[in-house]
Amino acid sequence: MVKGVKGRPNVLAIVLAGGEGKRLFPLTEDRAKPAVPFGGTYRLIDFVLSNLVNSGFLKIAVLTQYKSHSLDRHISLSWNVSGPTGQYIASVPAQQRLGKRWFTGSADAILQSLNLISDEKPDYVIVFGADHVYRMDPSQMLDEHIASGRAVSVAGIRVPREEATAFGCIQSDDDGNITEFLEKPADPPGTPDDPDMTYASMGNYIFTTEALIQALKDDENNENSDHDMGGDIIPYFVSRNDAHVYDFSGNIVPGATERDKGYWRDVGTIDAFYECHMDLISVHPIFNLYNSEWPIHTTSEGNLPPAKFVRGGIAQSSMVSSGSIISAGTVRNSVLSNNVVVEEGATVEGAVLMPGVRIGKGAVVRHAILDKNVVVRDGELIGVDHVRDAQRFKVSAGGVVVVGKNQVV
């Protein structure tokens, strides 16, 4: 692990957390995508922050912009690691240091925050996204980046070629040098050792600091640039033969099983978000939340009582978080966040219920996601009458009904 001890490089981690997440609407109607609750007790940003902290990186700047109040509050309450040793996880909003404008792209976000780099004077800068579900030890990627001698390393995950058209794709030679970076290509390139697989970019990068600063300044003066890390900065280095691919399949996380090794999910759509939750409650989930050797950290639930099941209330094949009460109701194949109440005769099946949701007596909720503080009236049906659902709520391509935050239905 890289812990900033004597003889180790000085590293600053920057987490890009300003994403709007339009494809997750209405879950992102009132919050930034990285702040969306996940897995009962977490938020999406907890995964990248846990990976960095577990790996020993404790100088972390989280760049925020879009509807960031929930995210800022979560970071301040859950991720307070500041101390006399210079460790911190800080939420950094758009500061308009280069004029009265917001971030125009992910590269522009870092350009406008170069003061963070000049203050820390790091040898290397980690730039990771904030909205994926995975475990990773970034220190292993840093070690390989240093050994490569390149200006940037891009984390690549192996995906079948036919599934890679939705990603930024990496073509590399046998030595890991990136020869081409293609955005959502119709014919993705194979990996050097397997023509049926493609390196898809995970949106995680490690830069040698001086090279990153120069690239950002050159990009600022490029009128044809969209000022995007994946779309502009990485191709900038590829064109200079100065980019390396890091094969994520070789990343070894303590406590990982063969089943969840190399797991990484983009939960940027309602269906992907829902399916990822359904995996969590399976008997043998691909992604194991219960790995104590590489924990996913979040707000302590020490002040909440345990979940309670009364008057014959039951939960089968489900995750039920602290403070929740199931009173003579039935929950199956569902994920319940904190302080959820399921009342007498209610049925919840195949659902994701976020904090504070209340399901009234005799109500039925199926194949649905209910955002924070939704109240379902007695006898109401959700996920039963598809025509009526479509008239009232968003329904995904996969048929998942989504009820937005604070609604009473």
Swiss-Prot record:
It catalyses: alpha-D-glucose 1-phosphate + ATP + H(+) = ADP-alpha-D-glucose + diphosphate. PROSITE patterns: ADP_GLC_PYROPHOSPH_1, ADP_GLC_PYROPHOSPH_2, ADP_GLC_PYROPHOSPH_3. It comes from the Bacteria. Alpha-D-glucose 1-phosphate binds at G168, E183, K184, S201. Its EC number is 2.7.7.27. The keyword Transferase applies. CDD domains: ADP_Glucose_PP, LbH_G1P_AT_C. Pathway: Glycan biosynthesis; glycogen biosynthesis. Involved in the biosynthesis of ADP-glucose, a building block required for the elongation reactions to produce glycogen. Catalyzes the reaction between ATP and alpha-D-glucose 1-phosphate (G1P) to produce pyrophosphate and ADP-Glc. Belongs to the bacterial/plant glucose-1-phosphate adenylyltransferase family. Homotetramer. This is Glucose-1-phosphate adenylyltransferase. It comes from Corynebacterium glutamicum (strain R). The lineage of its organism: Bacteria, Bacillati, Actinomycetota, Actinomycetes, Mycobacteriales.
